[in-house]
Every structure is written in C-alpha cells, then in structure tokens.
Swiss-Prot record:
Keywords assigned: Cytoplasm
Compartments, as annotated in UniProt: Cytoplasm
Gene of this entry: tiprl
InterPro entries registered for this protein in UniProt: Phosphatase_reg/MetRdx, TIP41-like
Taxonomy, superkingdom: Eukaryota
Organism in which the protein naturally occurs: Xenopus laevis (African clawed frog)
Identification of the protein by name: TIP41-like protein
Family: Belongs to the TIP41 family.
A Pfam family matched in the record: TIP41
Keyword Cytoplasm: yes
One CC-aspect GO term: cytosol
Function: May be a regulator of serine/threonine-protein phosphatases 2A (PP2A) and 4 (PP4).
GO BP terms: TOR signaling
Length: 259
C-alpha cells in the first residue's frame, strides 16, 4: 500500500503576470465519490480520489490552464477498445488461480487510462492551442538553475485490487526565467502491461506562448524481460524502456489582450 501524507495545503507563487496555485487536501468522502461516479456514468472511481486537489496556472487577465482529477476522469474512454479487452483477458489469465478469475470484464475502463492534457481557463479569453514544430529545450531544463518554487499534487490513485497501480499526478518547478510542469498518468497491471501518458508544459518568461508535449508509452510486461523487475514500480526508471505509441506537440498561444 502506498502511503501518502494527507495534510492539507494551499500554496501560491507569483511568476510575473502568472499566479501558480497548488491545492492539496484530503481524499474525497465516499458519498461524494459515489455521486461523481454516477454523474460520469462509471461504476466506481479510483479508490484514492482527490477531487479537490488542483494545480492551476492563471494569468492576471484570467486565461490559463489547470489540472484536476475530475476533468481527467471525464476523458477516460469507457467504451471497450480491443486493447482494453485483450489486456483484461491477460489480466484474468495472470490470476487464473484466483477465485475471481472468471469474472466478467467490466463495461468501463478499470485502468482509468486518461489522455488528459489539462483544462483551459478563462471566460472571454483562452489559450489558443495550435500544432507546432517547436520543442521543449530539454538541455536548458537540465542546466542547474535555482528552483524558486516546487510543488507536486496527487490527483488520483488506485491499486487495481492489489494487481498493480493506476495514478495521476502533476508537479511543477519554477526557475528564475521559466517554469516546467509534468502531468503523469502511470499504469502498471502486474504481469500484463505498463503504460505512461506524460504531458509536459514549458514557458519562458519572454515568450507569448507555452509549449505542451504529450507522449504516450506502453509495453507488455512480456516484452520487458531484459528490464530488472524492481524498475517496474519506478516510473522515472522504466520510462526509457517503453516504446512511444503517440506524441502530440502543441503551442498554447496567449490570447490578444483587449484594447
């Protein structure tokens, strides 16, 4: 069982015209979880659901982007794709000695896989999302710069009935002239597969846009026999061994200021 501190906190940091807010609070009450599950037409939600946790990046003009569990779960594809069914069948085979091995595949994505990339903020003005050939300068990110602000927020986590883990978390670090955010969905179904959906967001203070890069990686465990099993539980370590399934590169342009 993964242990997490549930101490509530509300951290704010100003970066030029941006206000960064990280709200961390307790797990949702079961009654609220049940109500939300009903609204989303899902039989159940992750066992650790932090529905009020949020990481928000908002400009003084009102536009911006935030990351929260509710919106992330809204884009979980609950129609059964072939990958999901095949995965569930393998999962059942992998626990054939279990009394539950004959259970019916549930009519929802029990892995909570989400390709969520954030929620755009603003009533009159919003960030304009366009495809781009520009890339986040990873070399610059490796340079040793002073960290002005750092926060990590867990959005949800589920241990898949002790057969792995599904989690979504977001962290941000602010340097003197830029900020970098990583939203990570990590899934491990023991004996079956590992999947990672990463969204990276980067902004330099003198630019009028953010760069957003989404990368989806996945591998069956059977194809990872060359990797030491202890790495299966370490997203940062296992990432390099997972083949890239999809990439999306976008520029989030700031809206024109009203005159």
């Amino acid at each position: 069982m993964m242990i997490h501190g549930f101490k509530s906190s509300n951290q704010e940091f100003n970066f030029g015209p941006w206000q960064l807010t990280a709200i961390k609070t307790h797990i949702m009450k079961s009654a609220d979880v049940e109500k939300l599950a009903e609204e989303m037409s899902m039989p159940c939600l992750p066992e650790m659901m932090f529905g009020e946790n949020v990481l928000r990046i908002q400009h003084t003009s009102g536009f911006g982007i935030e990351f929260n569990a509710n919106d992330a779960l809204k884009v979980v594809k609950n129609s059964q794709g072939s990958v999901k069914v095949a995965c569930a069948e393998e999962w059942q085979e992998s626990r054939s000695d279990s009394e539950h091995s004959k259970e019916v595949v549930k009519p929802y994505d029990w892995t909570y896989t989400t390709d969520y990339k954030g929620t755009l903020l603003g009533d009159n003005m919003k960030l304009n999302v366009v495809p781009t050939t520009e890339r986040i300068n990873t070399e610059k990110l490796k340079a040793k710069e002073q960290i002005m602000f750092f926060e990590e927020v867990l959005l949800f986590e589920d241990e898949l009935h002790d057969h792995g883990v599904s989690s979504l978390s977001v962290k941000i670090r602010v340097m003197p002239t830029s900020f970098f955010l990583l939203l990570r969905f990590f899934l491990r179904v023991d004996g079956v597969l590992i999947r990672m959906n990463d969204t990276r967001l980067y902004h330099e203070a003198d630019k009028t846009f953010m760069l957003r890069e989404y990368t989806s990686k996945e591998s069956k465990i059977s194809n990872l026999s060359h990797v030491p099993p202890p790495l299966y539980t370490e997203p940062n370590e296992i990432s390099q061994y997972l083949p890239v399934i999809q990439t999306i590169y976008e520029k989030l342009e700031f809206p024109s200021q009203p005159h």
